[in-house]
A protein has these predicted regions:
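N-terminal Rossmann-like NAD(P) cofactor-binding subdomain of oxidoreductases
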Residues: 1-217, 257-261, 328-329, 333-338, ...
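Charged docking surfaces used in two-component/phosphorelay signaling
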Residues: 69, 164-371
C-alpha cells in the first residue's frame, strides 16, 4: 500500500483538508504518516485508524520513505526541504498547497474538473509535482468552466473581494479583534437611542485611526474598511495577486502559448473565508443569454447558477451563504450595454475548500489510483 506523508496538516488549509478526507473516507486508501516541524515524537492524529507518533518534517530520510508527500506547511518549508529531498534521489510525488513551485516547468497546477486531461498527460510523461492553484483563480475557473471548455472567452476583467482567510489564520483572528474593538468603543452610543448616528460614526472613525487599533497583521484596518492591495508590488502598478489571475489561469488550461487575457484588481474585504469576484467578460461571439446560462450551469456538479433577481441574489450570492460549502454559486449574469458580446457575472466560493484543500484531496486520490 502506498505511503503518504502529511506536513502542515494542523494549519488552516491542512485542517480543512483533514476534515474533507475523513468525510470522503480517503485514509483507508493508503498508509498515513504525519510529520511535524515542532512536535516530533508526540502522538499523531488517529485519522487513519492506527496510532503512531509524529515524524520530524525536516528529516530527509524519513520523508524519502514516502511514495507521496502532501504539504500545507507553506512556501518557506517547500523552498527549504523540497530541493534537498529531490537531491537525495527521492522519486516520489510532491503535492503542495504553497505557491513556490506553481510556475516551474515540471509542475502542474491542479484543478482536475478543468484540466484532468493535462494531469493525465503529465503523469504519463513522468511528472511528479502537483501544485494547488491560487484560490481566486481556481474559484473563477470552476464558476466559468463551461465557457472556458467551449473556448468562448476572449478576455475577462476580474475585480475580487477577498476574505481574510486568504491572508492566514492570524489575519482572521485580527479581523475579529478589529470588529470587537470597534463595537466595544461604540457600545454605549449604540445602546443609547438618543445618540446621533453621526456621533456613532465619528466614534467608529476615531477608533479605526487609533494608535491602539490592532493592525499587526494587516498593517491597516480591515473591519469597517477594505485593503485595495494584496500580495507583493511587482513595480509595474500590478500586485502579484493580480498577476496570478492571468499567469495561473493559462497554465492550468495549458494555454501558455495562446493565453486568454485576464486583468483586474484584487481587494481584501472584511469577510472571513469566502472570496467573491465581479466579472466583466467579453465573449468571442454573440450568443443568447439562455445558452450562456445553460453552458455555465451544466459544466460541473459544483457550479450553481443563481437567477439574476434581487432577492435570490442577496440570499445566495454572499460569503455568509457559501461558507463551508463546496458549491460555487454564480449569478448577476446579463448582457452589458457595451455590446452583445459583453456579459457580467458575480461569483462566490469558499477559499478553504475549492480554493485550497479540495484540489489537493482530489489529486491525491487520482495518484493513489494511478500508482
Amino acid at each position: 500500500m502506498n505511503r503518504v506523508g502529511f506536513v502542515g496538516w494542523r494549519g488552516m488549509v491542512g485542517s480543512v483538508l483533514m476534515q474533507r478526507m475523513q468525510e470522503e473516507h480517503d485514509f483507508k486508501e493508503f498508509d498515513s504518516t504525519f510529520f511535524s516541524t515542532s512536535q516530533t515524537g508526540n502522538a499523531a492524529p488517529f485519522f487513519s485508524g492506527s496510532q503512531s507518533t509524529l515524524k520530524d518534517a525536516h528529516d530527509i530520510k524519513e520523508l524519502a520513505a514516502m511514495n507521496i508527500i502532501l504539504s500545507c506547511q507553506g512556501g518557506d518549508y517547500t523552498s527549504d526541504i523540497y530541493p534537498k529531498l529531490r537531491d537525495s534521489g527521492w522519486q516520489g510525488h510532491w503535492i503542495d498547497a504553497a505557491s513556490s513551485l506553481r510556475m516551474e516547468k515540471d509542475a502542474v497546477i491542479i484543478l482536475d474538473p478543468l484540466n484532468s486531461d493535462l494531469i493525465q498527460e503529465a503523469y504519463k510523461k513522468g511528472n511528479k509535482n502537483w501544485i494547488g492553484g491560487n484560490c481566486t483563480v481556481s474559484l473563477m475557473l470552476l464558476a466559468l468552466d463551461g465557457l472556458f471548455k467551449k473556448d468562448l472567452i476572449e478576455w475577462i476583467s476580474s475585480m475580487t473581494y477577498q476574505a481574510a482567510s486568504g491572508a492566514g489564520a492570524q489575519n482572521m483572528r485580527e479581523l475579529i479583534s478589529q470588529m470587537g474593538n470597534v463595537y466595544n468603543h461604540a457600545k454605549d452610543l449604540i445602546d443609547d437611542p438618543k445618540a446621533s448616528i453621526l456621533d456613532i460614526d465619528r466614534n467608529v472613525s476615531s477608533t479605526l485611526k487609533s494608535q491602539d487599533f490592532p493592525i499587526d497583521n494587516f498593517g491597516v484596518p480591515l473591519a469597517g474598511s477594505l485593503i485595495p492591495w494584496i500580495d507583493k508590488d511587482l513595480n509595474n502598478g500590478q500586485s502579484k495577486e493580480e498577476w496570478k489571475g492571468s499567469a495561473e489561469t493559462n497554465k492550468i488550461l495549458g494555454r501558455e502559448n495562446n493565453p486568454i487575457v485576464i486583468e483586474g484588481l484584487c481587494v481584501r474585504i472584511g469577510a472571513m473565508r469566502c472570496h467573491s469576484q465581479a466579472l466583466t467578460i467579453k465573449l468571442k461571439k454573440n450568443i443568447s443569454l439562455e445558452e450562456i446560462n445553460q453552458t455555465i450551469s451544466s459544466a460541473n456538479q459544483w457550479v450553481k447558477l443563481i437567477p439574476n433577481e434581487r432577492e435570490i441574489s442577496m440570499k445566495e450570492l454572499s460569503p455568509a451563504a457559501v461558507t463551508g460549502k463546496l458549491s460555487i454559486p454564480i449569478g448577476r449574469i446579463r448582457k452589458l450595454n457595451m455590446g452583445p458580446e459583453y456579459i457580467s457575472a458575480f461569483t462566490v466560493g469558499d477559499q478553504l475548500l475549492w480554493g485550497a484543500a479540495e484540489p489537493l484531496r482530489r489529486i491525491l486520490r487520482i495518484l493513489i489510483k494511478s500508482i
